[in-house]
Every structure is written in C-alpha cells, then in structure tokens.
Amino acid sequence: MFKSILVATDGSELGEKSVSAAIELARAHGSKVLVLTSSDPVMTGVGSGGFGSFDAAPIIARLDEDYAAHAKQILAKAEENLSAAGISARTLHVPRTRPADAIIDVAKQEGCDTIVMGSHGRRGIGRLLLGSQAAEVLSRADIAVLIVK
C-alpha cells in the first residue's frame, strides 16, 4: 500500500491539502504520484432542433479550451509543490468526465493502490458533509482512499 498514489485535485483549498497529504505519504513510503484533475462533461443538448436552435459547437469548443487551460494551471501548481518537496510526479487532465469516474478509471488503469482526495470540491456545501464525488469514490473504489478535510 502507498506505493502508487493517485491524488485528485480541482485546485480548491481541499485539493491543495490533498496534494500536501500525498506529498507526506510519498515521502514516508517512497511512492509514485499521479496528479489528476478532470473537467465535467459539457452539455451538448443546447439547441438540439426545432425553431430557434443554433450551432452550439463553437461554444462547446471554447468551453473545452477554457477547461483545459484551467486544468493545466491546477496541474502545474500541484507539480510545482511536489517538485519543491523533492517528489517527481506525473500529471493528467481527463476532459469531459465526472470526477468520480475519472478517479476510479485512472486508478485502475494506472495500477494505483491509494487515492487521495478532498472531502468535497468547489461545489461542496459544507465542511461537515461528504461531497457526492468523494462518497462515490469511497463506495466504488477497491483500493485505499484517503479523504482530506
């Protein structure tokens, strides 16, 4: 356990705390670290026919570009923090994918044995509640999950 850590971050305060927790685990166990962020799917049903419909493709393409640029910033900051701690890490942005799905799928594909993530993301409604994505990862993961508060 703790040999291959996937740390999920959305750039929020808890996302940054999750990266810090992954740093401590990696230091203690000599772990490999993969930093992941995902972008939610973009709704594509806008103007799907009938009177008044329009071509949403340019808007969706722009949203995808904006999400990718934001993900790049999030991952660069996490990588900088890991590097400053003497830990090399890989980074990955998974576009158009719900966070829980991205976390579970990538952890399996990469053979990770531990997931580190915040108790809730930017959409979280309170520090005492477990966010829906964290709850889903906990229920679906077959590896260790560290929830950071």
Residue map of PLM features:
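Small/aliphatic-rich secondary-structure junction motif
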Residues: 3-58, 81-90
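Structural beta-alpha unit
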Residues: 76-115
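Structural motif
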Residues: 36, 92-94, 148
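Short, well-ordered secondary-structure micro-motifs
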Residues: 18, 45-48, 101-104, 127-129
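Gly/Ser-rich helix-loop-strand patches that form or flank binding pockets
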Residues: 24, 105-149
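Conserved residues at the C-terminal ends of beta-strands
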Residues: 8, 95, 118
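A short acidic, glycine-rich active-site loop
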Residues: 55-73
